Amino acid sequence: MKETGIHNKAASISTSGLKELSAVFYNLGPARLYEETIRRGEAELSAQGALVARTGQHTGRSPKDKFVVRDANTEDHVWWDNNKPMTPEAFELLYADFIEHAKGRELFVQDLIGGADADNKINARVITEYAWHSLFIRNLLIRPSQEALASYVPEMTIIDLPSFKADPERYGVRTETVIAVDLTRKIVLIGGTSYAGEMKKSVFTALNYILPAKGVMPMHCSANEGPNGDTAVFFGLSGTGKTTLSADPTRTLIGDDEHGWGEHGVFNFEGGCYAKTIRLSAEAEPEIYATTQRFGTVLENVVLDENRQPDFDDGSLTENTRCAYPLDFIPNASKSGKGGQPKNIIMLTADAFGVMPPIAKLTPAQAMYHFLSGYTAKVAGTEKGVTEPEATFSTCFGAPFMPRHPSEYGNLLRKLIAEHKVDCWLVNTGWTGGAYGVGKRMPIKATRALLAAALDGSLNNAEFRIDPNFGFAVPVEVPGVESSILDPRSTWADKVAYDAQAKKLVDMFVSNFEKFESHVDHEVKDAAPAIRMAAE
């Protein structure tokens, strides 16, 4: 077996049971990985030098095909209502078949790190069948120094073989696609999908399981730091503005997607970004756009024209087009991947019902309530003439990646908020003056002005009113922001329609939260929205 590249000889790929391979490439850099990718016909080059790969039928994650091994260790610690179990025997069989399937193949190994905090990191080895997957994950995770690679010992191993097709009957799975996670042995097997995001989220899932036991809060969020060292954390589901609002030229970007919060403050789990590129433009998002125009970036499912120019407006392969690049491709990114204790937490929502105010201040109990709710609203497809928005509740703002019960994360968050006296804000980037189809999108200028006032501390001195539906505190006046926008009811022409819409949304919150009622105390239960009669 031919082995190339810097690695710890005492911790070679054979320690994972992989044998009789034709070649193993360890820790290759971008140029070598480009060569191998092109040689194998796995991807194309854009005119600017980015590597452009297509993932075939899977253009997103496959949450229904993800399984967690249910054993003596995980039995009482995993939230089985939300995680599909796999028996240890089925996993063992799958693992043996992966090893058999890999025989005679060339494999690529990247020895990487998840977690910028030395006390809370995991050494994650990622073994891939595709060369472009090796570059992708190298861009996304933290890269050890050349010296460190010589003594690197993996604590977690991910084996990604897209050509492996799972037999549902043999392993008790759903389809030919499988993502099997053994949290006890820290092994992840990915088969039957070429979507690269599965690898990144597997490391996130492992850290989300390991860290709470150490009192460290894992978060699906972006984070940045102001010139005075004040750290801000942005929670939010897809499409709420997490990446856009945390990319602020006046602040240092710590990371855009996954972080931990421990005794030393906030730290990035990753060393790169995985940004959406559909309708990306140099005008709207210059820093992200610039990363797509250079060597080293991986473009996923982006359409190229005949001159190899990327067309970011073309969603014919998927709306979920992406780019993966190292964090240092962003000019104002943090070099350490670390920030201090957060001063502000922002929970983003895009309320398409037009009910929520553009900003509200939350108590620690309200913050836990809204964190467990994880609300946003998707806008229905207009092609069928459906204008009714759809409420989405994804607990902890990232349910698919949270192996433990949400209340564990919620209680940890509440404890840290109280301990460090963090200001918490709910920011609505959705609709104002009516629901989607009637009202208009919240002006980004207003959102940025409100956010700036929250982050610089001046918003704490504003006069607040209590929202009659949600019970949180809403500023009455903020310099540079039209006052009417701060009171959503006043922006609706039809006040009766507003009250009906508010009641509808409150009822959705209440019924969604029923499953958490037995896991929270009275203070959090009392933070639930309730209809209080609004004055005309």
Swiss-Prot record:
The keyword ATP-binding applies. GO terms for molecular function: ATP binding; metal ion binding; phosphoenolpyruvate carboxykinase (ATP) activity. Its EC number is 4.1.1.49. Pfam families: PEPCK_ATP. Its cofactor is Mn(2+). Binds 1 Mn(2+) ion per subunit. GO terms for biological process: gluconeogenesis. Substrate binds at residues 61, 195, 201, 322. It is found in: Cytoplasm. It comes from the Bacteria. ATP binds at residues 201, 220, 236-244, 285, 322, 447. Keywords: ATP-binding, Cytoplasm, Decarboxylase, Gluconeogenesis, Lyase, Manganese, Metal-binding, Nucleotide-binding. InterPro entries: PEP_carboxykinase_ATP (IPR001272), PEP_carboxykinase_C (IPR013035), PEP_carboxykinase_N (IPR008210), PEPCK_ATP_CS (IPR015994). Pathway: Carbohydrate biosynthesis; gluconeogenesis. PANTHER family: PHOSPHOENOLPYRUVATE CARBOXYKINASE (ATP) (PTHR30031:SF0), PHOSPHOENOLPYRUVATE CARBOXYKINASE ATP (PTHR30031). Involved in the gluconeogenesis. Catalyzes the conversion of oxaloacetate (OAA) to phosphoenolpyruvate (PEP) through direct phosphoryl transfer between the nucleoside triphosphate and OAA. Belongs to the phosphoenolpyruvate carboxykinase (ATP) family. This is Phosphoenolpyruvate carboxykinase (ATP). It comes from Brucella suis biovar 1 (strain 1330). The lineage of its organism: Bacteria, Pseudomonadati, Pseudomonadota, Alphaproteobacteria, Hyphomicrobiales.
